[in-house]
């Protein structure tokens, strides 16, 4: 009987150990699953925030494609891929690459007369006005900077700058700036080319970090990573999801917000208490210094009075 009782005790102990091991393994599995769920929620929130930022970049992407035919541009399907209205990611790219300015200017030239806000997108010019286009292309536009002088005698001491657009260059309309320096008479006009060293100096002054950032931004804008009509179509749904996620985050983390508020209050009270103590100590020190100064002044006055009295007595004697 004693042996049977010992066997039963051993079996019960083994069962208890197995139960505790099973419970601990279940707890470990539950904690692992909770950790995975938290990681998934964090990844979901990060992904949602990135998508929202992406949509903000594409928010003004109300562009359409047009085709060009006989000098006219009409609204239509994507044939040549000429973009009329730029998206937010493509705006101000001339800031990083000024050589693209001519290409943008060609798309936005006023003599094409593209009305972006009309449905038919009709041209303001007629088809027979090719001569006017040739006139605009052939005649150089010159800007003369006149001197800001009042006296006619000082007119020979200024530098006149003329900006001339050379349209004869192939596929490139760059401005050649020439400086006319007046030396005495009109016959002694000296024609000097404008030294184009400003770009080199500015590139030397730019740090490497800014240069890398400029190239990186141009790479992103060149591949149009933030230009997606699908995201524009899904904008309302993703915006609602983003708002819902932010509200759930705030509601779920109310206790952390309350704890931070209480901690801030405690820190403020501690700082105010220390500040009051310092002010009281400073006031006490100032009062003590004032009292000492008053006592010293009184002692000096008494000494002066005593000296005066002694001098008077000595004179009488």
UniProtKB/Swiss-Prot annotation:
Bias type Low complexity, positions: 8-17, 279-311
Motif PEXEL motif: where in chain: 86-90
InterPro entries assigned to the protein according to its UniProt record, in alphabetical order: GATA_zinc_finger
Composition-biased stretches (Polar residues): 18-30
Domain of life (superkingdom): Eukaryota
Disrupted-gene phenotype: At the asexual blood stage, causes an accumulation of vesicles at the Maurer's clefts. Aberrant knob morphology and distribution; knobs are fewer and larger. EMP1 delivery to the Maurer's clefts is normal; however, EMP1 delivery to the host erythrocyte cell surface is abolished.
Membrane topology summary: Single-pass membrane protein
Region (Disordered): 1-32, 277-317
Region (Essential for its function): 265-317
Residue ranges the record marks as coiled coil: none
Gene Ontology biological process terms in this record: symbiont intracellular protein transport in host; vesicle-mediated transport
Keywords: Host cytoplasm, Membrane, Signal, Transmembrane, Transmembrane helix, Transport
Subcellular location as annotated: Host cytoplasm; Vesicle; Membrane
Subunit structure: May interact with MESA. May interact with J-dot compartment protein PF3D7_0801000.
Record remark on domains: The P.falciparum Export Element (PEXEL) motif, also known as the vacuolar transport signal (VTS), is a pentameric sequence (RxLxE/Q/D) required for the translocation of proteins across the parasitophorous vacuole membrane. In the endoplasmic reticulum, the motif is cleaved after the leucine residue and the N-terminus is N-acetylated.
Protein name in the entry: EMP1 trafficking protein-7
Species, as recorded: Plasmodium falciparum (isolate 3D7)
């Amino acid at each position: 009987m004693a042996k049977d009782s010992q066997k039963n005790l051993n079996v019960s102990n083994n069962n208890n150990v197995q139960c505790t091991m099973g419970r601990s393994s279940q707890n470990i599995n539950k904690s692992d699953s909770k950790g995975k769920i938290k990681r998934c929620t964090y990844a979901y929130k990060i992904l949602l925030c990135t998508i929202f930022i992406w949509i903000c970049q594409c928010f003004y992407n109300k562009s359409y494609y047009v085709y060009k035919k006989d000098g006219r541009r009409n609204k239509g399907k994507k044939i040549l891929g000429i973009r009329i209205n730029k998206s937010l990611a493509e705006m101000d790219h001339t800031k990083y690459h000024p050589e693209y300015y001519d290409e943008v200017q060609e798309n936005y030239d006023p003599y094409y007369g593209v009305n972006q806000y009309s449905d038919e997108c009709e041209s303001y010019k007629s088809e027979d006005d090719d001569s006017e286009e040739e006139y605009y292309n052939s005649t150089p536009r010159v800007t003369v900077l006149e001197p800001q002088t009042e006296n006619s005698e000082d007119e020979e001491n200024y530098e006149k700058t003329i900006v001339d657009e050379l349209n004869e260059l192939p596929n490139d309309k760059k401005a050649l700036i020439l400086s006319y320096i007046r030396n005495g008479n009109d016959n002694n006009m000296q024609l000097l080319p404008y030294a184009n060293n400003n770009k080199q100096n500015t590139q030397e002054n730019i740090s490497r970090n800014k240069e890398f950032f400029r190239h990186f931004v141009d790479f992103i804008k060149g591949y149009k990573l933030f230009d997606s009509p699908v995201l524009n179509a899904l904008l309302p749904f993703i915006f609602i999801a983003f708002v819902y996620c932010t509200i759930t985050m705030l509601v779920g983390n109310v206790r952390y917000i309350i704890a931070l508020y209480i901690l801030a209050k405690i820190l403020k009270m501690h700082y105010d208490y220390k500040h009051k103590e310092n002010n009281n100590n400073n006031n006490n020190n100032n009062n003590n210094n004032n009292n000492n100064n008053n006592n010293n002044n009184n002692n000096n006055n008494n000494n002066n009075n005593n000296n005066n009295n002694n001098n008077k007595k000595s004179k009488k004697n």
